[in-house]
Amino acid sequence: MKIGILTQHFLLNYGGIIQNFALQQVLLKLGHDSLTFEHDTCYSRTRWFLRTIKHILRTRSFRNLPVYPIYKGRIGNKNFIKFVLRNIRSVPVKDFVPSLTAQYGIDAYVVGSDQVWRPAFNLGPRLGNMFLDFADDKVKKLSYAASFGCKKWEYTKEQEKACSKLARRFDAISVREASAVDLCKNHFGIDATLVLDPTLLLNKEDYEKVCNNIPKKENHIFVYSLVVGESVMNVASKVSEAKGLPIVVKEAGGKVKKEDTIEDWFAEFRDAEYVVTDSFHGMVFSIIFNKPFSIVMNPSGGNDRYISLLSQLGLTECIVDEKLTPSSAIIDWEQVCSRLNVLRESSLLFLKQNLR
C-alpha cells in the first residue's frame, strides 16, 4: 500500500525526527511504501498572538498556551536536514486538500506518532488536518501511537465536537498512553488500542547500523534534556561522582548545536554507562540500548507518557524522587526485553491487521 503519514516533525527535535524515521522503516519492513506530508506554511505571528490572548481571556490562566511554531527559516541544523533527506521520504504541503490523495496515489493515511492530537501543538487548521478532515471516505484512515501529550483534556468544546466527528471516520485508532485510551473513550466515544511508540518497534541493531561510522566513545554519563536545568544536572552530578565518570550533555530544541547529528545522538546511548534524562525519547533509547537510567519528571505535569511505558515494562523505579536521588535500580534487562517483545508484537499486529 502507499501510505501518507501526518506527524509532528520538528527539525530541531531528535525525537520528532526519529519517530518518523522509525515508522517509515517499520512500514517498509511490512511491505508498504510511505511518504510523510510536511506542513510548508508558517502560521502567522498575528494569528498566533490573537489565539494566545483569546486563550488567556477564556481560561483566565497562562497554562497550556499555544506553542509558537517553528518557522521554515529557523529550523534545524544542516546535519539534521541531511539526515531527513537521506532517511525520510517527505513532501512539503501548503494546504491539505482532498486532491492530495489522488495526486500521490495514497491508499491509506496514518496519523502519528508523537503529540499529534495536542491542540497547543496544532494551531489553526492543523488540528483538523491531524484528524484527516481533508481525506474522503474512500481512503483508509488510522492513527498509530497518537498522543494528546497529557492526561488532562485540553480541547475546547468546539474542538471536541469537531474532532470527535472526524475521529469516528477512522478505520482504527491506536494511542501511545493508557490515559489516551480513556480520553478517546470519554470524549470521542471511541475504543482505542494502546501501542508502543514507533521507535520501540525497531531494535538496537537497527539503530546501531545508523551510527556504525561513529567511533566508540569513552564511558560517560549521558545527559539528554529538553531544557537542561538544575534538577537534571543535580542528578547527573551525583551519578558522575559515584561512578567517577565525565558528563556529556545534549539538549533538545533551540539548544541543538550546529555540529550535532542524529547519528552521534544514537552513539551517545550506545556508549554511555548511565543516562539521565527528562525526555520521553531519551527514556525510550535508554531502554532500547539497555542502559541504566534516571528519568526526571516535569513538575508542571505531562508525565503520563513516561509513566505509561515504565509501568508496562516494570521500570517505575527509574523515576527520580523528590529528593533528586538517582535511580540505583538493578534492571533485569532480560525480563524488560521479554515484556517489550510482547508489546512490540501486539503493536505490529495493529499495523498488519489495519493496513491490508
Model-derived regions, located:
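Active-site anion-handling motifs in enzyme catalytic cores
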Residues: 1-356
